[in-house]
Swiss-Prot record:
Major enzyme class: isomerase
Enzyme Commission numbers on file: 5.3.1.6
Family indicated by similarity: Belongs to the ribose 5-phosphate isomerase family.
GO BP annotations listed: D-ribose metabolic process; pentose-phosphate shunt, non-oxidative branch
Keyword tags: Isomerase
Alphabetical list of PANTHER family matching this protein: RIBOSE-5-PHOSPHATE ISOMERASE
Functional summary from the UniProt entry: Catalyzes the reversible conversion of ribose-5-phosphate to ribulose 5-phosphate.
CC per GO annotation: cytosol
Signal peptide (residue range): none
Full protein name: Ribose-5-phosphate isomerase A
Length: 219
């Protein structure tokens, strides 16, 4: 299978976790787009979706899937999203698509996080993929200085404004051996909206696409 075929395979496999007449949390990115396309085939069997980005909302609505505001939902069963990296502890780096804050919020409300990814995203130690940090524009340079103190090399992602009207710093050069601790430390820096570490709330199930098919990993 090609990488695109692996993404389609895990998107299709995630449908097995969708229960009838429920609300589905939907992430953002190319792999999630494959899930959204697959979800359209059973759209009459679900209540609605909660979306983590304007891009996913547009795709869902274009396929005739109702999107509801997270503020109108108390909880829902599953949140389906991709990852830029995922380690054996089911901790992830996310935010390559700049939707990390809304993704983290929607994931927090879901009972279960279903991560869908191709095998190239599996790593033993996270950090080769630059760690995204969403920041208030006023604080960008201050946050960058603090991130350098942690051993990282933050690079401003020029030309990108998040759905929250904030900016992204991509932190290169980290070897993340304690993701839970680093997530807390970075989130405490004034001016940080959130860091793209999903460790405090990691994945419960990972559907990993490879040339041999889809492998299911559970926490």
């Amino acid at each position: 299978m090609t990488q695109d075929e692996m993404k389609k395979a895990v998107g299709q496999a995630a449908l097995a976790y969708v229960q009838p007449n429920t609300i589905i949390g939907v992430g953002t990115g190319s792999t999630v787009n494959c899930f959204i396309d697959a979800l359209a085939s059973i759209k009459d069997q679900i209540k609605a979706a909660v979306s983590s980005s304007e891009a996913s909302t547009a795709r869902l609505q274009a396929l005739g899937i109702t999107v509801v505001d997270l503020n109108d939902v108390t909880e829902f069963d599953i949140y389906v999203d991709g990852a830029d990296e995922i380690n054996p502890h089911m901790e992830m780096i996310k935010g390559g698509g700049a939707a990390l804050t809304r993704e983290k919020i929607v994931a927090a409300v879901a009972k279960r996080f279903i991560c869908i990814a191709d095998a190239t995203k599996q790593v033993e130690v996270m950090g080769k993929f630059p760690l995204p940090v969403e920041v208030i524009p006023l604080a960008r340079e201050y946050v960058a200085r603090e991130l350098r103190k942690l051993g990282g090399n933050p690079v401003y992602r020029e030309g990108v404004i998040t759905d929250n009207q904030c900016q992204i710093l991509d932190v290169h050069g980290l070897q993340i051996t304690n993701a839970k601790a680093l997530e807390l430390v970075i989130n405490q820096i004034p001016g940080v909206v959130t860091v793209g570490l999903f460790a405090q709330r990691g994945a419960d199930v990972a559907l990993i696409g490879s040339p041999d098919g889809v492998t299911t990993i559970t926490k």
